């Protein structure tokens, strides 16, 4: 069963496979067509040879990359086979083993600096799976990665904080100067972004926030900021992220996040909660408790945080709506909001918070999780009946804590019960404050060093691309 979010899964299933469901990447053939025909033979080594009047010619294997799939209007299932090899635990272990061997043989030119970035949601998923406190879980996961050969193990908090700050600034600017692009839609969910690009294209893309997701902000920090601090070339760093959903693999593979200057991706490999569980099981670690703990690294400032697992009150997907609501209330209307009350609407995955002044609603925010609510919101937008200013929108029901690659429930527990426990655990964690010393240092020494906002725009923001569907006669069902 596919673990991609519902927004990316194939829904039109029947016995007729149309080109939109198959891989429809066109193959460019350089050779001219032969008027006399040709003969193709398979050699003993498995290669293909084409015999023509001009002689024998070895045929090259057709390769379709994940980037090709992202630029195609076909369904996302076409990419799953590629993901297995390019973004998998097998590929990660292969790289780690090769790197350890290069270190052992003193082949310094072949050694890469390996950085693991771990999101909050996988830590909570693993904590529930192995019945450990969240902070201890992170330390033992760090110990496991260190044993594999990791050089640094960091959390995503600094990238989460930057995403919140850039998101709030973008919202205030739109509210004051460009209200036709409201509601602003959160951009951290790659499942929703990919769905929007392929299904609704140029209509919906202006509404999506340009702020990068925390994963891709972290990619910039590791490959550009941290690389400079450590004196390491960006292409010598192998950056691994641990995320709660498979859609993050697609996000990391977008061409927007490949640097032509450094000739490398911001994120080289994405693995998920369930893959970490499989890796532990595969290495004979049946209980995370037996893994030796290791400290989480903090290269961003001199002051080390007291904890490394943080939470938000409103949602398990990063707290975008809660933080932006509080900031907008204070910045735009001079109202201090200590607690944002999100009320359920049609279902628990669609919630709303409002700010009123003199009996008038001046701010209306929503949290919309799951494909059903995404579709409803899009239809409201198209009919001009969407009166929200901001929507935290996630493809998975219940958001990122219930991501498609989170560890499955055991012992007869339902998915709903497990998700409720994860949400309660997330809300019990120390509240994150994005305005802190580390964030200020990154802005001062890196992003604002040039004296303007160009680096902020280049490194913390992105753009989206409508993907037109290819209509051919083969789409006709007889």
Swiss-Prot record:
Gene Ontology MF terms: 4 iron, 4 sulfur cluster binding; metal ion binding
Function: Component of the cytosolic iron-sulfur (Fe/S) protein assembly machinery. Required for maturation of extramitochondrial Fe/S proteins.
Keyword terms of this UniProt record: 4Fe-4S, Iron, Iron-sulfur, Metal-binding
Organism field: Culex quinquefasciatus
Any Pfam family hit: Fe_hyd_lg_C
One biological process term in Gene Ontology: iron-sulfur cluster assembly
Record: residues binding [4Fe-4S] cluster 1: 23, 69, 72, 75
Protein name as annotated: Probable cytosolic Fe-S cluster assembly factor CPIJ010948
Classification of source organism: Eukaryota, Metazoa, Ecdysozoa, Arthropoda, Hexapoda
Family listed: Belongs to the NARF family.
Residues engaged in binding [4Fe-4S] cluster 2: 189, 245, 396, 400
Signal sequence extent: none
InterPro entries associated with the record: Cytosolic_Fe-S_CAF, Fe_hydrogenase, Fe_hydrogenase_lsu_C, Fe_hydrogenase_ssu
């Amino acid at each position: 069963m596919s673990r991609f979010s519902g927004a990316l899964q194939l829904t039109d299933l029947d016995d007729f496979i149309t080109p939109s469901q198959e891989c429809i990447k066109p193959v460019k053939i350089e050779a001219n067509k032969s008027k006399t025909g040709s003969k193709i033979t398979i050699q003993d080594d498995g290669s293909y040879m084409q015999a023509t009047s001009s002689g024998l010619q070895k045929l090259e294997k057709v390769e379709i990359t994940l980037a090709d799939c992202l630029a195609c209007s076909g369904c996302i299932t076409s990419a799953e086979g590629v993901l297995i090899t390019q973004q998998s635990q097998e590929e990660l272990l292969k790289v780690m083993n090769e790197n350890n061997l290069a270190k052992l043989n003193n082949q310094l030119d072949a050694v890469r600096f390996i950085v693991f970035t771990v999101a909050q949601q996988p830590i909570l998923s693993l904590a529930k799976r192995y019945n450990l406190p969240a902070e201890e879980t992170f330390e033992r996961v760090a110990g496991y990665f260190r044993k594999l050969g990791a050089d640094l193990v960091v959390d995503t908090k600094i990238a989460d904080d930057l995403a919140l700050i850039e998101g709030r600034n973008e919202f205030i600017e739109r509210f004051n100067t460009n209200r036709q692009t409201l509601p602003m839609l959160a951009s951290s969910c790659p499942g929703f972004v990919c769905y929007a690009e392929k299904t609704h294209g140029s209509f919906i893309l202006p509404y999506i926030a340009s702020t990068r997701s925390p994963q891709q902000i972290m990619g910039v920090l590791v490959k550009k900021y941290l690389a400079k601090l450590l004196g390491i070339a960006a292409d010598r760093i192998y950056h691994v992220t641990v995320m709660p959903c498979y859609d993050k693999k697609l996000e990391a593979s977008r061409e927007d996040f490949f640097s032509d200057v450094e000739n490398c991706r911001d994120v080289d490999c994405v693995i998920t909660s369930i893959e970490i569980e499989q890796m532990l099981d595969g290495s004979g670690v049946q209980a995370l408790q037996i893994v030796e703990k290791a400290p989480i690294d903090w290269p961003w400032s001199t002051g080390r945080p007291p904890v490394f697992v943080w939470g938000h009150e409103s949602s398990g997907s990063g707290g975008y709506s809660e933080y932006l609501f509080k900031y907008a209330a204070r910045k735009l209307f001079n109202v201090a909001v200590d607690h944002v009350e999100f009320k359920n609407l049609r279902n628990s995955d669609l919630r709303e918070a409002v700010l009123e002044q003199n009996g008038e609603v001046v701010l209306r925010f929503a949290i919309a999780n799951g494909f059903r609510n995404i579709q409803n919101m899009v239809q409201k937008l198209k009919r001009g009946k969407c009166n929200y200013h901001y929507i935290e929108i996630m493809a998975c029901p219940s958001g990122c804590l219930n991501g498609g690659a989170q560890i499955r429930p055991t012992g007869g527990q339902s998915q709903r019960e497990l998700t409720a426990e994860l949400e309660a655990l997330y809300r019990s964690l120390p509240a994150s404050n994005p305005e802190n010393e580390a964030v200020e240092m990154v802005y001062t020494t890196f992003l604002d060093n040039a004296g303007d906002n160009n680096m902020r725009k280049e490194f913390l923001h992105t753009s989206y691309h409508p993907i037109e569907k290819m209509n051919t006669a083969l789409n006709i069902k007889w």
